Amino acid sequence: MVAGRIDGVCVRGIVGCVPEGRETVDDLARRFGEDAARKVAAATGIEERRIVAPGQCTSDLAEAAARRLLDGLGWDPASLDLLVLVTQTHDQVLPGTASLLHRRLGLRKGAAVLDITHGCSGFIYGLWTAAGLLRAAGRRALLLVGDTTSRLVDPDDRAVAPLFGDGAAAVALEQDEFAAPIAFDLGSDGAGAPYLAAESGAMRHPGRPARLFMDGTQVFAFTLREVPGSVRAALDAAGWTMESVDHLVLHQANAQMIRHLGQKLGAPAGRTVVALREVGNTSSASIPLALAGALAPSLNTASRRLLLSGFGVGWSWGSAALVVGPLALCETVVLPGRKCPAETAAPASPTS
C-alpha cells in the first residue's frame, strides 16, 4: 500500500469526450434476446454504451477532450510542462500514444510525456503521477485518460459485451501554493492478473485475437475485499470523515456494485454518484466522465470535497480525497463518427 499527500497542485478544469456511436439495450436484445438484455440492464444500470467508429482510437477521443479543455481555459499548449496519458488500448505498439498526442496537440519540444498502462484504477494512478511530477518540477500538466475497450470485446460474449463503452477525459493541473492537499492510497496484487485480462497482441501472444476475459465473481470479491480499506485510508490521509465528503465517485463498473460499496462505506444518502446509464463501463475514463457529466453543475459553481476510487485489472486499486472547484470548465463533448482519425490529418506544428 502507498498512502500519502501531495501539496500545492490544483485541478483547473475537466472535459470528458465520448464517441457519437451508441449501442442500446434494444441492440443487445436483437443479439441475445429480449429477456437476457433487459435483465443485464436492470442489474448493471447500463442502458446504452458509446462505441467508437471504425478507424477511431483512444488518442482521437483524448485529443478532442484536450483541445476543448485547453481552449476553454485559454491555455497555450506550449505552456504545458507535462502530459500523462493513461490507457490500456494504445493506438500502436510504439511509440507511446502520449508521444503521438505531444505532436498533435502542439506541445513544446521540451515538455515531458509519459504513458501509463492501467485500466479501471488508471485515473487515480494518473492523478497521483501527474500531481507528484508537477509538484517536483513544472507549472502546468495535462492528464489524459481513456480507453476504447469495445475493440477488445467479443460482441457475442454475454459476460462483457453489454458492459463496456468507450470514452476519454482531460484534466488540467496547475501548481498552486494555496491548493488543499490531495490524499492518496494505492495498491496492487498481481495474483489477480488472470481474472481480468486480454491475453493477446504484444510479444507473448502476437497472433492471438484481442479478446477481453472477465471473471465477474472474482472481480466482485476483489472489489469488496480491497476497495473499502483503500477509501478509508485516503479519508484518513486527508483528515476527513465520510460525512464531510460532498461526493463519493467510484469506478463506474455497475450500479449494483457502486451502491453496495457506498452503503458499506457509510456514505450519506444521495452522495454516491451513479453515472453509467448512458455510457457504460468506460474503464480508466469512468471517474472523470462522471465528474464532467453528472457532477458538472456542482463543480462549475462551488468547491467540493471529492472522494474517488478506481479498481480493476491487475489487480490494482487507488483512492484519492481532494477539493475541486469551482472549475473554469467542466463538461463533456462528443466526437462525431464521421471524424477522420487524427493521424491521417495534418499534424499540429510543435513549438520549440
Where are these regions (language model features)?
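Short beta-strand segments
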Residues: 12-15, 86, 117, 141-147, ...
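Acidic-glycine-rich active-site phosphate/pyrophosphate-binding loop
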Residues: 33-42, 92-107, 143-149, 198-203, ...
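Glycine/charged-rich beta-loop-alpha catalytic/anionic-binding loops adjacent to active sites
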Residues: 46-48, 79-84, 103-117, 150-156, ...
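Phosphate/pyrophosphate-binding loops at sites that engage ATP/ADP/AMP, CoA/4′-phosphopantetheine
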Residues: 65-81, 229-246, 294-299
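Claisen-condensing/thiolase-fold acyl-transfer catalytic domains that form or cleave C-C bonds
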Residues: 59, 63-66, 89-90, 108-110, ...
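Condensing-enzyme catalytic core mediating Claisen C-C bond formation in acyl metabolism
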Residues: 1-54, 157-221, 225, 229, ...
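Flexible, glycine-rich active-site loops centered on histidine and acidic residues
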Residues: 131, 135-167
